[in-house]
Amino acid sequence: MLHISFLGVAQHCHILKERENNVLKKSPIYSSHENQIYLLDSKIEINEQLSADICHMVLNCPEIAATAKPGQFIHIRCSDGLSPLLRRPISIAMADIDTGTIEIIYRVVGEGTKILARKKKGETLDIMGPLGKGFPIPEGIKFPAIVGGGIGVAPLLFLAKAINTANKRETAGIIFAGFSSDDETFGTFFMEDCGFKLEICTDDGSRGYKGFPTDLLEKYINDREIENDTASVNSSKEIIGPMSPHVEIKAGGKNAIDIIYACGPKPLLAKVKSIAAGAGIPACLSLEERMACGVGACLGCAVKSAEGGYMKVCKDGPVFEASQVEI
């Protein structure tokens, strides 16, 4: 533990030194072929309350807006003092190169986010990012499913926009979004504007389906299998002779899901992983873990790898292929 703490302190001191040398020049404190990380004082353009404990903030930071990818996050220093000492990791809900802004949606749950909620337009925040590995968008995907729960819906807005831009199709895919109640829903109009069919769930039934988004995901996949099963049997008789309908299903059908993206609490991610594995559909999961350093130094966010050992959510993730991690 002493060794890990020393690494965290050393990394923090290194960042402070780099900040003095580089931030005024707006150059990245870290750069690789995959990512550039900036440490910036970012001006708050908007900080508004969406519901009782959910807030939306817009930050002016052209460097991060130009390089951020869906699924990545920023590390925010909430206070100039020592309390809270650690930065808060918050996913990027949107990035706009034209305006040079990024957006975050956060839940007020502790000291750090309470301080964030009190910040005013025109104030600045010390932020580091973009951090982590985001969602892959493979070429050739035809009908992705996006599954989000609670505040985990936030980074999926950015993903929906990116998929819409890449696909340029009338129907980009389907989104299953779960919230506690209608009062806590957000981003719904935007998701529909991105061309996605939207299914909303609430725990109390105040809007949409009463239950979990994974219930609807499972039902959707099962319904498509039944439809494609019938279609495959009919076509096999006419064209190619007897063949297992199961093979035809794997080849896809109308609006058959070919990849699943998910972000939310662990029970949701575990269920998505199980559903995807059973249906033979690849899935990418964005994990939520407490983070201290945000750059892989302190090992505080380690999760078990499916192949043995551990992986760091902040650096190796937060997005992983479902088969890579144990949940």
Where is each model-derived feature located?
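Ferredoxin-reductase
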Residues: 29-121
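FNR/FR-type flavoprotein reductase catalytic core
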Residues: 111-285
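Local cysteine-cluster metal-coordination motifs and their immediate loop/turn environment
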Residues: 266-267, 288-317
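Short, basic/aromatic-enriched C-terminal tail that caps enzymatic domains
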Residues: 38, 310-327
